[in-house]
From Swiss-Prot:
Residues 1-20 are cytoplasmic. InterPro entries: LexA/Signal_pep-like_sf, Pept_S26A_signal_pept_1, Pept_S26A_signal_pept_1_CS, Pept_S26A_signal_pept_1_Lys-AS, Peptidase_S26. Belongs to the peptidase S26 family. The chain crosses the membrane at residues 21-41. Its EC number is 3.4.21.89. The gene is lepB. GO terms for biological process: signal peptide processing. GO terms for molecular function: serine-type endopeptidase activity. This is Signal peptidase I. One of its GO terms (cellular component) is plasma membrane. Its main location: membrane. It is found in: Cell membrane.
Length: 266
Protein backbone atom coordinates (compact mmCIF):
# COMPACT_ATOMS: atom_id res chain seq x y z
CA UNK A 1 0.00 0.00 0.00
CA UNK A 2 1.27 3.48 -0.91
CA UNK A 3 1.48 5.78 2.08
CA UNK A 4 0.86 9.53 2.05
CA UNK A 5 4.59 9.98 2.57
CA UNK A 6 5.39 7.91 -0.51
CA UNK A 7 2.81 9.79 -2.60
CA UNK A 8 4.24 13.09 -1.40
CA UNK A 9 7.80 12.04 -2.32
CA UNK A 10 6.65 10.81 -5.74
CA UNK A 11 4.84 14.07 -6.46
CA UNK A 12 7.85 16.05 -5.27
CA UNK A 13 10.20 14.07 -7.53
CA UNK A 14 7.88 14.53 -10.52
CA UNK A 15 7.69 18.28 -9.90
CA UNK A 16 11.48 18.47 -9.63
CA UNK A 17 11.89 16.56 -12.91
CA UNK A 18 9.40 18.79 -14.71
CA UNK A 19 11.05 21.84 -13.19
CA UNK A 20 14.47 20.70 -14.43
CA UNK A 21 13.03 20.00 -17.89
CA UNK A 22 11.39 23.44 -18.04
CA UNK A 23 14.66 25.07 -16.92
CA UNK A 24 16.62 23.32 -19.70
CA UNK A 25 14.03 24.38 -22.29
CA UNK A 26 14.18 28.00 -21.09
CA UNK A 27 17.98 28.03 -21.29
CA UNK A 28 17.88 26.55 -24.81
CA UNK A 29 15.36 29.17 -25.91
CA UNK A 30 17.42 31.99 -24.41
CA UNK A 31 20.53 30.74 -26.20
CA UNK A 32 18.63 30.64 -29.50
CA UNK A 33 17.07 34.07 -29.00
CA UNK A 34 20.11 35.93 -27.63
CA UNK A 35 23.32 34.06 -28.44
CA UNK A 36 23.38 31.61 -31.34
CA UNK A 37 20.86 30.26 -33.84
CA UNK A 38 21.12 27.55 -36.52
CA UNK A 39 19.87 28.21 -40.05
CA UNK A 40 19.39 25.99 -43.08
CA UNK A 41 20.34 27.51 -46.44
CA UNK A 42 18.01 26.31 -49.22
CA UNK A 43 19.44 28.26 -52.18
CA UNK A 44 22.76 28.67 -54.00
CA UNK A 45 23.20 32.46 -54.02
CA UNK A 46 26.32 32.16 -51.82
CA UNK A 47 27.76 29.16 -53.69
CA UNK A 48 30.43 27.89 -53.21
CA UNK A 49 31.07 29.60 -49.85
CA UNK A 50 27.71 28.23 -48.73
CA UNK A 51 25.98 25.43 -50.63
CA UNK A 52 22.34 24.39 -50.78
CA UNK A 53 21.46 22.39 -47.64
CA UNK A 54 24.36 23.73 -45.60
CA UNK A 55 23.34 24.21 -41.98
CA UNK A 56 25.05 27.19 -40.41
CA UNK A 57 25.46 28.59 -36.92
CA UNK A 58 25.15 32.34 -36.55
CA UNK A 59 25.74 34.67 -33.62
CA UNK A 60 22.78 36.82 -32.58
CA UNK A 61 24.78 39.21 -30.39
CA UNK A 62 27.20 40.33 -33.13
CA UNK A 63 25.10 43.34 -34.16
CA UNK A 64 22.99 43.79 -31.05
CA UNK A 65 19.26 43.04 -31.14
CA UNK A 66 16.30 44.24 -33.15
CA UNK A 67 12.73 43.06 -33.38
CA UNK A 68 13.72 40.89 -36.36
CA UNK A 69 16.58 39.14 -34.56
CA UNK A 70 14.46 37.88 -31.66
CA UNK A 71 13.43 34.35 -32.68
CA UNK A 72 9.76 33.49 -32.11
CA UNK A 73 8.92 37.15 -31.42
CA UNK A 74 9.90 38.83 -34.69
CA UNK A 75 6.25 39.02 -35.79
CA UNK A 76 5.40 41.13 -32.72
CA UNK A 77 6.37 44.84 -32.96
CA UNK A 78 8.11 44.96 -29.58
CA UNK A 79 10.39 47.91 -30.38
CA UNK A 80 12.05 49.81 -33.23
CA UNK A 81 15.75 50.12 -34.03
CA UNK A 82 18.47 48.08 -32.31
CA UNK A 83 19.63 47.72 -28.72
CA UNK A 84 23.28 47.02 -27.80
CA UNK A 85 24.03 47.79 -31.47
CA UNK A 86 27.46 46.97 -32.91
CA UNK A 87 28.46 48.15 -36.37
CA UNK A 88 28.92 45.41 -38.99
CA UNK A 89 32.13 45.06 -41.00
CA UNK A 90 32.59 44.83 -44.74
CA UNK A 91 32.76 41.20 -45.78
CA UNK A 92 30.51 39.92 -43.00
CA UNK A 93 28.08 37.20 -44.03
CA UNK A 94 24.74 38.34 -42.65
CA UNK A 95 21.36 36.69 -42.12
CA UNK A 96 18.61 39.28 -42.52
CA UNK A 97 14.98 39.93 -43.43
CA UNK A 98 14.71 41.43 -46.94
CA UNK A 99 12.66 44.64 -46.80
CA UNK A 100 10.53 43.53 -49.78
CA UNK A 101 9.48 40.20 -48.18
CA UNK A 102 9.55 39.91 -44.40
CA UNK A 103 8.34 36.28 -44.51
CA UNK A 104 11.75 34.93 -45.57
CA UNK A 105 15.39 35.20 -44.47
CA UNK A 106 18.31 35.90 -46.80
CA UNK A 107 22.01 35.32 -46.34
CA UNK A 108 24.48 37.50 -48.29
CA UNK A 109 27.86 39.18 -47.99
CA UNK A 110 27.96 42.80 -46.81
CA UNK A 111 29.82 44.97 -49.32
CA UNK A 112 28.59 48.55 -48.97
CA UNK A 113 28.30 50.66 -45.81
CA UNK A 114 26.13 53.76 -45.26
CA UNK A 115 27.41 56.65 -47.39
CA UNK A 116 29.28 54.41 -49.85
CA UNK A 117 29.16 54.71 -53.62
CA UNK A 118 29.04 51.22 -55.14
CA UNK A 119 29.26 50.06 -58.75
CA UNK A 120 30.25 46.89 -60.63
CA UNK A 121 32.16 47.35 -63.88
CA UNK A 122 33.12 44.20 -65.80
CA UNK A 123 32.43 42.17 -62.64
CA UNK A 124 34.85 44.25 -60.53
CA UNK A 125 33.43 45.99 -57.45
CA UNK A 126 34.17 49.72 -57.15
CA UNK A 127 33.74 51.25 -53.69
CA UNK A 128 33.88 55.04 -53.63
CA UNK A 129 35.43 55.04 -57.13
CA UNK A 130 38.24 52.65 -56.14
CA UNK A 131 38.21 49.11 -57.47
CA UNK A 132 38.83 46.30 -55.02
CA UNK A 133 41.60 43.74 -55.50
CA UNK A 134 40.30 40.81 -57.56
CA UNK A 135 42.41 37.88 -58.77
CA UNK A 136 41.32 34.78 -60.65
CA UNK A 137 42.59 31.78 -58.68
CA UNK A 138 41.09 28.79 -60.48
CA UNK A 139 37.79 27.12 -61.24
CA UNK A 140 35.03 25.44 -59.28
CA UNK A 141 32.88 22.59 -60.60
CA UNK A 142 29.54 22.33 -58.80
CA UNK A 143 27.88 19.05 -57.79
CA UNK A 144 25.64 19.52 -60.84
CA UNK A 145 28.71 19.70 -63.09
CA UNK A 146 28.48 23.44 -63.75
CA UNK A 147 31.80 25.26 -64.17
CA UNK A 148 32.50 28.53 -62.36
CA UNK A 149 35.49 30.85 -62.44
CA UNK A 150 36.84 31.39 -58.92
CA UNK A 151 38.14 34.79 -57.78
CA UNK A 152 39.81 36.01 -54.62
CA UNK A 153 38.58 39.46 -53.65
CA UNK A 154 39.94 41.83 -51.01
CA UNK A 155 37.83 44.64 -49.57
CA UNK A 156 39.25 47.99 -48.35
CA UNK A 157 39.32 46.74 -44.74
CA UNK A 158 41.54 43.79 -45.73
CA UNK A 159 38.79 41.15 -45.56
CA UNK A 160 39.34 38.50 -48.25
CA UNK A 161 36.90 35.93 -49.61
CA UNK A 162 36.11 33.99 -52.78
CA UNK A 163 33.50 34.90 -55.37
CA UNK A 164 32.29 32.75 -58.24
CA UNK A 165 31.18 33.55 -61.78
CA UNK A 166 29.66 31.20 -64.34
CA UNK A 167 32.30 30.32 -66.92
CA UNK A 168 31.52 31.70 -70.40
CA UNK A 169 29.98 29.15 -72.78
CA UNK A 170 31.25 29.54 -76.35
CA UNK A 171 32.43 33.02 -75.39
CA UNK A 172 28.99 34.12 -74.21
CA UNK A 173 28.95 35.87 -70.81
CA UNK A 174 26.05 34.98 -68.54
CA UNK A 175 23.81 37.78 -67.24
CA UNK A 176 25.79 40.88 -68.19
CA UNK A 177 23.41 43.16 -66.25
CA UNK A 178 24.92 41.68 -63.06
CA UNK A 179 28.44 42.39 -64.31
CA UNK A 180 27.88 46.07 -65.19
CA UNK A 181 25.54 47.96 -62.91
CA UNK A 182 24.26 51.42 -62.25
CA UNK A 183 25.87 53.48 -59.49
CA UNK A 184 24.38 52.80 -56.05
CA UNK A 185 24.56 55.38 -53.25
CA UNK A 186 24.00 53.61 -49.94
CA UNK A 187 21.66 55.63 -47.66
CA UNK A 188 22.30 56.22 -43.98
CA UNK A 189 21.30 53.28 -41.81
CA UNK A 190 21.26 50.88 -44.77
CA UNK A 191 23.65 48.40 -46.39
CA UNK A 192 24.52 46.92 -49.78
CA UNK A 193 24.77 43.13 -50.16
CA UNK A 194 26.07 40.74 -52.82
CA UNK A 195 25.93 36.97 -53.14
CA UNK A 196 29.26 35.20 -53.67
CA UNK A 197 27.60 33.39 -56.59
CA UNK A 198 27.65 36.58 -58.62
CA UNK A 199 25.54 35.50 -61.61
CA UNK A 200 22.83 33.71 -59.62
CA UNK A 201 22.01 35.93 -56.67
CA UNK A 202 19.02 38.13 -55.96
CA UNK A 203 20.92 40.84 -54.12
CA UNK A 204 21.28 44.63 -53.85
CA UNK A 205 22.07 44.91 -57.58
CA UNK A 206 18.56 43.86 -58.52
CA UNK A 207 15.34 43.18 -56.59
CA UNK A 208 16.67 43.26 -53.03
CA UNK A 209 17.83 46.86 -52.91
CA UNK A 210 19.37 48.26 -49.72
CA UNK A 211 18.84 46.55 -46.37
CA UNK A 212 18.15 48.55 -43.17
CA UNK A 213 20.34 47.75 -40.15
CA UNK A 214 17.17 46.98 -38.22
CA UNK A 215 16.53 43.97 -40.50
CA UNK A 216 19.78 42.21 -39.53
CA UNK A 217 19.20 38.94 -37.66
CA UNK A 218 22.65 37.46 -37.08
CA UNK A 219 26.22 37.07 -38.34
CA UNK A 220 26.91 33.69 -39.98
CA UNK A 221 29.99 31.98 -38.51
CA UNK A 222 30.45 28.34 -39.54
CA UNK A 223 28.83 25.32 -41.16
CA UNK A 224 27.88 22.67 -38.60
CA UNK A 225 26.23 20.17 -40.96
CA UNK A 226 25.71 19.72 -44.69
CA UNK A 227 23.88 17.33 -47.04
CA UNK A 228 23.44 17.11 -50.80
CA UNK A 229 19.73 16.34 -50.56
CA UNK A 230 16.91 17.34 -48.23
CA UNK A 231 15.38 14.60 -46.11
CA UNK A 232 12.42 16.24 -44.42
CA UNK A 233 9.47 17.20 -46.62
CA UNK A 234 5.95 17.70 -45.29
CA UNK A 235 4.42 16.54 -48.57
CA UNK A 236 6.04 13.12 -49.12
CA UNK A 237 4.57 11.07 -46.26
CA UNK A 238 6.09 8.90 -43.54
CA UNK A 239 6.90 5.88 -45.75
CA UNK A 240 8.81 7.99 -48.26
CA UNK A 241 10.66 9.72 -45.43
CA UNK A 242 11.85 6.32 -44.21
CA UNK A 243 12.88 5.32 -47.75
CA UNK A 244 14.73 8.61 -48.16
CA UNK A 245 16.67 8.30 -44.90
CA UNK A 246 19.50 6.11 -46.27
CA UNK A 247 20.28 8.25 -49.35
CA UNK A 248 20.07 11.34 -47.15
CA UNK A 249 22.67 9.91 -44.74
CA UNK A 250 24.87 8.93 -47.70
CA UNK A 251 24.63 12.49 -49.03
CA UNK A 252 26.26 14.07 -45.95
CA UNK A 253 29.17 16.32 -46.99
CA UNK A 254 31.69 15.38 -44.31
CA UNK A 255 34.31 17.79 -45.69
CA UNK A 256 32.05 20.77 -44.95
CA UNK A 257 31.17 20.02 -41.33
CA UNK A 258 32.53 22.67 -38.91
CA UNK A 259 33.90 24.77 -41.77
CA UNK A 260 34.70 28.37 -40.85
CA UNK A 261 32.91 30.63 -43.34
CA UNK A 262 35.74 33.18 -43.22
CA UNK A 263 38.58 30.76 -43.95
CA UNK A 264 40.21 31.50 -47.33
CA UNK A 265 42.86 28.77 -47.19
CA UNK A 266 40.74 26.40 -49.31
Amino acid sequence: MQTDNTKSNTNKTAKQEWGSFAFVICIALLIRILIMEPFNVPTGSMKATILENDYIFSTKYSYGYSNYSLSFFDFIPLFKGRIFAREPDRGDIVVFRPPNDMSVRYIKRLIGLPGDKIQLIDDVIYINDKKIERTEVGTYISEEGIKYLKFKETLPNGRTYFSYKLAPIYGVIYNDRYSNTDVFYVPEGQYFFLGDNRDQSNDSRVNLGFVPFENFIAKAQFIWFSTKITWWDNDIGVINLVLKLKPWIESVRLNRIFRNLYNTDA
